[in-house]
Structure formats: C-alpha cells, structure tokens
Regions:
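Amphipathic helical "hinge" segments at domain boundaries
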Residues: 1-9, 98-101, 105
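Hydrophobic alpha-helical segments within soluble ligand-binding/sensing domains
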Residues: 36-83, 94, 98, 121-132, ...
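Flexible loop/turn connectors
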Residues: 55, 129, 133-206
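A short acidic, amphipathic alpha-helical/loop segment
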Residues: 15-21, 99, 156-160
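Short loop/turn motifs at secondary-structure junctions
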Residues: 2-3, 77-80, 110, 142, ...
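Flexible loop/hinge segments that line or gate small-molecule binding clefts
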Residues: 11-65, 152, 178-190
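C-terminal regulatory
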Residues: 105-147
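Periplasmic-binding protein-like
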Residues: 2-11, 30-32, 82-85, 114-115, ...
C-alpha cells in the first residue's frame, strides 16, 4: 500500500528475470550487471511497453573497473594470468568474466580461466593448490599474476601461494575485486578494485 516505487537488487539471473516479470505499475529501478545468461534486452522484453517507460536499470561500471586492472597488469609487464571466475549464475561474475576475456586479449595477456562455483575463499584456495601442484608436475612456471572476481577468492589464492613459499608480489601478483573490509590489513595488502557502491546507491534512489 502507498508504494511510490520498487527497487530490485538482482545479483543473479533468476532475480533479474523475476524483477522484470514483476507485475507492478509503479516506477521500478533494477540494480544489476550488464551481462548474464539472460541479456538486458531479453529482460526488458518481459516488461510491457507502458511499464518499460517507468523502468530504469543501474549498475557499476564493471568494464571500466576491469580495464583498470588489465592496464595495471600491462604496466607491470605481465603477459600471463590466472583468472578466478565467480559462479556463472551471478551477473557480476558473468560481466567481469566477459570483460576480463576481451580486455586481457586486447593486451595480449595469456589467460587461464579457473571456474568457481562459489565466491568462497576455501574453493579458490583448493583450486590454487591444485594448480600449483599441476604446474609443478609439468615443470612449468606459473603465470605471473592472479586476478580474482572478488576479494574472498583472492584471499584464498594468497593463502595457497604463501603456503607454497611463493612471495607476493615478488614471485606472483594478486588482484581482487570489491575492496572488502579488512583486505588492506593483509600482509601484503591486497590490491583490489573499489567499486563505487555509494554512487550506485545514489543513482538507484534518483
């Protein structure tokens, strides 16, 4: 009753589809990422023409943020990297992976994608341990950088690297995403992307 507008936070494809299908006549703001298994165009196609005029989509510039990550790697001369992708049903994970693939290729960075089913540090830790062992068995050098789709994953990879005696950043660089609380107090501090969540909130409330 007496609702002026609806604000939908839709980190996953299922949530995005539900927000688009919602039968509301009030203005709706959908906070989401640009890429996913359901495209923005497909989602908007679920909204009637009349209601579409009262619908706004807002989100963080994930591509711009990833471009800064790739530029930083290029600045330090990295030519190879492991990319820890988030769960594919999350639109942020899908968008960041798409951005990473295209932008890394544009900088001629050889990229190995490590697919994770969760955002958990423990899963990234297990994957990193496996990769270190696998590269060791082959007598191959690890890529010179790790890029993670969120900071939890980056923390997991850092633990595995430390336990195998690899120094950060002397032996391998690690970059996270989201600037989670506490990562600046790690040793060494985690290099991470700081999304403008405050700006996103302001944009959504406009």
């Amino acid at each position: 009753q007496n609702v002026d507008a609806f604000l939908f936070l839709t980190p996953t494809d299922v949530m995005f589809a539900a927000a688009c299908r919602a039968r509301v006549t009030q203005p709706r703001v959908i906070v989401t990422a640009t890429h996913g298994q359901m495209t923005v165009r497909e989602g908007l196609g679920l909204i009637s023409t009349e209601n579409k005029r009262r619908t706004a989509l807002v989100g963080i510039d994930q591509w711009g943020a990833m471009a800064k990550v790739v530029a930083l790697l290029g600045e330090y001369g990295h030519k190879s990297a492991l990319y820890f992708a988030g769960p594919n049903e999350w639109r942020d994970a899908h968008t960041r992976l798409d951005a990473w693939r295209k932008l890394a290729a544009s900088r001629s960075i050889d990229s190995q994608i490590v697919r994770c089913h969760t955002w958990d540090a423990s899963e990234a830790y297990a994957h990193m341990n496996h990769l270190i062992d696998e590269y060791g068995r082959r007598g191959a050098a690890l890529p010179t950088a790790v890029v993670a789709a969120n900071d939890n994953q980056a923390v997991g990879t850092m633990r595995a690297l430390h336990e195998h005696g690899l120094r950060i950043p002397q032996d391998i660089s690690v970059v996270g995403f989201d600037d989670m609380s506490g990562v600046d107090n790690m040793y060494p501090p985690l290099t991470t992307v700081h999304p403008d969540f405050e700006g996103l909130g302001v944009a959504a409330m406009r």
